[in-house]
Amino acid sequence: MKLINHRLLLLSLVILGSCNSKKEVQTVSLKDSYKKDFYIGTALSKDQIEEKNATEDSLIKKEFNAITAENIMKSMFIHPEKDKYDFTLSDKFVAYGEKNKMFIHGHTLIWHSQLAPWMEKIKDSTAMKAFMKDHITTIVSKYKGRVDSWDVVNEALNEDGTLRQSIFLNTLGEKYLIDAFKLAAAADPKVDLYYNDYNNEEPAKREGNINLIKKIKAGGGKIDGVGIQAHWKLNYPSLAEIEKSILEYSALGIKVAFTELDISVLPNPKDLNGADVNQNFEGNAKMNPYPKTLPDSVQVKLADRYASIFKLFLKHKDKISRVTFWGVHDGQSWLNDWPVKGRTNYPLLFDKDLKPKKAYYEVMKQNDTK
């Protein structure tokens, strides 16, 4: 009888130890796993900023230590009329980050897309200069010492590395880029200032981006980092090109951030890459192969892709400041409606039910020695 009790006691201790071990593993988060390496961030929607879903909110606070506003700081929302700013949501966003001791990234000051209608009517250089000075100075000054970094200019390059035609280039010429960084630095000398773009890990666009950064510096602009958006696919871009980009941008003496990371598992019409919001195509069943669930075989491919990417990030952790996912979970991803509306994509680490996917565990595994 005594022997049986000892066995029962031993079995109980083993079971208890196993349960505690599982609980401990589950409490480890992305931000904790990578806290010695770089920030792990996410883009927040309006509803998430307003904490409308308690389960989502708990997940955000547990897993991430950096935040970017997905939309509400873009000009059409924050500066809807010439003499009117609306800081209601941006105030909530910054307060959310401060309350949760998160790195706060402002997105974005100058971008050719999602402009307020009144901005699109600006036709001459004098009016454009006045707009840029007022817009950048007002917003950056308001959050001086509270926002940690800004995307000063977003997506100003074509795929071949030349400057994109935009209302800013057409009215002010390429000097608008230097002026934007000067204005932001004057408004908050200590905040980190970034240029942000997609596909700028591809050779031609990367070369154009490097030349642009050099011009901004030569013109007296303060630029602290480059944002590589990282809207990628299962097989694009190559790890070699990503690594070249990290090395070549870092060699300029600036920080490298991956700012909008997601990995599409769906076919793209015409096999286009990147994140040009003007790309829109009609959908069909072939373009939406996984409307209900992602097959295990594709889950494995997604997990392997994320694993290889984060292994590379860790190799160059001394050069990388932040890795931000473009959304918290699959259900909110912009890729469900781009470049084809109404599809079901699975590009992030958490599914639409907020459950961690195989890709999540593979990302965690890359750093499980710490």
How would you name each of these model-derived features?
Residues 2-11:
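Sec-dependent signal peptide recognition
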Residues 121, 142, 151-174, 183, ...:
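Aromatic-rich peripheral "rim/lid" segments of glycoside hydrolase catalytic domains that contact
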Residues 16-18:
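C-terminal motif of bacterial Sec signal peptides marking the signal peptidase cleavage site
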Residues 20-22:
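Bacterial signal peptide processing site
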Residues 32-33, 37, 45-57, 167-285:
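Noncatalytic carbohydrate-binding groove/subsite architecture in carbohydrate-active enzymes
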